[in-house]
């Protein structure tokens, strides 16, 4: 209403820059943001009303998941002297270190070199068909993972001031986390803040017969392929996202016959 009133007062171009009109439009712009914050606050208060907030807290923050997001969150909290507990049920480093970024880039490097050898004539060199041990290629992948592991280890983060618990966390209420330790015991911690960085897992499509096909996922193929002596002759890669596309290209360059299947209109649809 105020903006409309100020607009009605304009009788020249100079009036557009009047303090009153500018202030009116500023208020018009920020009002929805303020209203949303107030509404969200009211909704949150109603939701939280069903639980009793602790008077004292065991921790300032509990982080669930020791992947990239969880490690960074816990490190920053510890750096500002917060009392932080990091809970991880499986491997420290999460998807990036163990199943995604690190192993995929390692095998991409080997595959790129094999590809360049085949096409060395483009660089003025004699092209050659690469001869290699697939077991050695996979061993290199795992060696690189092991070389990086200490940077994401329990010992390192404990040294940084993070309380690391290996176990499975369940959120009891907005301020309480129950932890089933891998050792078998169960404990509870109250905390001011909870960071959920539990990550995700590969989606297995409900295809007829897939459960009995012996399929692999991006989580399991690294260990399973490390047991093989020879490169797989044929592969079907379901999925056209980053991991699927990286694996399809890498194994094709190493010499496998690869078929990539994507449900969408194109691969890398989010890129």
Label each region the model flagged.
Residues 2-49:
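Multi-pass membrane proteins that catalyze or facilitate reactions on polyprenyl-/lipid-phosphate substrates
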Residues 37-61, 79-80:
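Extreme N-terminal leader/targeting segments of oxidoreductases
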Residues 52-53, 57, 75-82, 87-231, ...:
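Glycine-rich flavin
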Residues 59-86, 236, 244-253:
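N-terminal Rossmann-like FAD-binding beta1-loop-alpha1 element of flavoenzymes
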Residues 227-271:
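Rossmann-like NAD(P)H-binding beta-loop-alpha module
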